[in-house]
Amino acid sequence: MGVPAGDVEKGKKLFVQRCAQCHTVEAGGKHKVGPNLHGLIGRKTGQAAGFAYTDANKAKGITWNEDTLFEYLENPKKYIPGTKMIFAGLKKPNERGDLIAYLKSATK
């Protein structure tokens, strides 16, 4: 099916509502319950410096891109069993597309 083209502004709203309590996106942003996501695209799982990842995240060994994020964000615990991310996921493909569009722009 592919990743739907997303709307950055809608994605930003989703991030604020669903992600910002645990993640930051800006360069040099602090880790919260979840890691800072700056530089996410092109980074391997479990690689944000200074964040204590689960072994499951470190061992997954995939590189974050549109396709891997699209699958992960639907159901994080299914994609990486053992992750400590408590987010249930975004079931609607267009919402995942919007969030990915935002993450691509906000984490460069």
Curated annotation (Swiss-Prot):
Keyword terms of this UniProt record: Electron transport, Heme, Iron, Metal-binding, Mitochondrion, Respiratory chain, Transport
UniProt-annotated binding residues for heme c: 19, 22-23, 85
Coiled coil feature spans: none
Any one Gene Ontology cellular component term annotated for this protein: mitochondrial intermembrane space
Record's subcellular location: Mitochondrion intermembrane space
GO molecular function: electron transfer activity; heme binding; metal ion binding
Keyword Iron: yes
Post-translational modification: Binds 1 heme c group covalently per subunit.
Chief location bin: mitochondrion
InterPro entries xref list: Cyt_c-like_dom (IPR009056), Cyt_c-like_dom_sf (IPR036909), Cyt_c_1A/1B (IPR002327)
Example GO biological process: mitochondrial electron transport, cytochrome c to oxygen
PROSITE patterns per record: CYTC
Protein family: Belongs to the cytochrome c family.
Entry-linked PANTHER family: CYTOCHROME C
Role played: Electron carrier protein. The oxidized form of the cytochrome c heme group can accept an electron from the heme group of the cytochrome c1 subunit of cytochrome reductase. Cytochrome c then transfers this electron to the cytochrome oxidase complex, the final protein carrier in the mitochondrial electron-transport chain.
Misc remark: There are two cytochrome C genes in Drosophila: Cyt-c-d (distal) and Cyt-c-p (proximal).
Name of the protein described by the UniProt record: Cytochrome c-2
The species this protein was found in: Drosophila melanogaster
